[in-house]
Design a protein with these regions (language model features):
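Polytopic transmembrane helical bundles with strong interfacial aromatic enrichment
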Residues: 1-196
């Protein structure tokens, strides 16, 4: 399936929905392999962690995290990563001009070359800003989960999750502040995968 997405990404000239599906599929594949590894490795410390009462909250965090990764992929494939060139504001304001209808049109035309994106700036801002707002929501949810886990025998897991979350937020901010250096963008993707 990933091979097909790779082929379509090139043959359809970087059509954003295909590129997003390809990147998102890679994250899902990595997550499944990681899950299989953790199950097969049978780490003993995982048997002693009592987090059953927080599974619901963890599941909500996971769903929002998958949505956030989709938004990150959509931001990347629509070349919207630099639509908000400042931080914490976006184009000097907290409520910039945004066009959600165009920004989240999943049925973009097949045929044109999407290299560097075809969307107008307000559409790109809507995409980028959605990624930022969802990051705030996800951070709040994960901090609640970390706080809950901190007072169980899963405190080491909570502190690790907190450090990875802090690193991910820092990389996201650095992407904007330092105008998207490739090594920071790659690290942002790798840490997103680690959060899964």
């Amino acid at each position: 399936c990933q091979g097909l997405f790779g082929d379509l990404t090139c043959s359809l000239k970087l059509l954003p929905i295909i590129g997003t599906g390809h990147l998102f599929g890679g994250f899902i594949t990595l997550s499944l392999f990681s899950f299989i590894f953790l199950k097969a490795a049978n780490f003993k410390f995982l048997h002693y962690i009592d987090i059953k009462k927080y599974r619901g909250l963890a599941f909500i965090c996971l769903v929002v995290l998958f949505f956030q990764i989709f938004l990150g992929a959509w931001t990347s494939t629509n070349y919207a990563s630099l639509a908000c060139p400042d931080f914490p504001t976006c184009q000097g304001t907290y409520l910039p001009e945004m066009d959600f209808e165009s920004g989240f049109n999943l049925k973009q035309e097949i045929g044109p070359n999407y290299l560097f994106g075809l969307l107008e700036n307000p559409a790109r801002v809507a995409i980028h800003y959605s990624h930022r707002i969802t990051a705030l929501i996800l951070t709040a949810l994960m901090l609640i989960l970390i706080g809950c886990l901190w007072f169980t025998n899963a405190a080491p897991l909570a502190s690790t999750l907190g450090l990875v979350l802090l690193l991910q937020i820092s990389l996201g901010i650095m992407n904007v502040v330092y105008v998207l250096p490739l090594y920071i963008a790659i690290a942002h993707n790798l840490i997103a995968a680690m959060l899964l």
